[in-house]
Each structure stands twice: as C-alpha cells, then as structure tokens.
Amino acid sequence: MKRLEIYFDSFYTEKMKEELREYGIDQYFIVPVVHSSWSKTFKHFNTHVWPGTDSILVTYLEDRHAQEIIRIIKIMKIDLGRGISMCAFILPFEDIIL
C-alpha cells in the first residue's frame, strides 16, 4: 500500500478529483487552502504581493495504482509548465483503518 500526496495550485482541485475518479479512487482527503513558498520568487500566500493558494490531496493506493497516478501527474506537470505549482510523492504505507 502507498500514500500519495499531491501539492498543487488550488485552481486545479476539480481536475485532480476528476483524475482520481477516472481510476476509481473515491477515498481521499483535500486540504483546500495552503500557503506555500516554492522558491524565493514563487509563492502562494493569497496576498496582493503573492496571490493564490495551493491545496494538498492525500490518498492511499494499492501499489499497482500508485505508479500510474504518478505517471499522469508527471504528464500534467509537463503540460502545465514551470509556472504552475505542483509536486507529488509516494510513501510506503503498512496499513490504514478507515
């Protein structure tokens, strides 16, 4: 089992949920508003100087789904370009009680 965390521009929340639905993933958690500092010149603090916010999506996947979802996120990141905040990582996970 794997824990997948995706950090992304909040504008793309519906797109993220849509991608998960396509793979039959209906259990996930979203932290809707996160203030992020991606670099010295790229931040989302929801202010007039640093507009926008990010979100975090967390889900737990069977091993066979994890790499496919990461592949899709890589494609999305390439399509969106460097100016859009997005990163993802997979962590091994022993068990979960939902």
Regions found by a protein language model. Name each.
Residues M1-L98:
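Positively charged, small/polar-rich N-terminal and surface patches that mediate targeting and assembly
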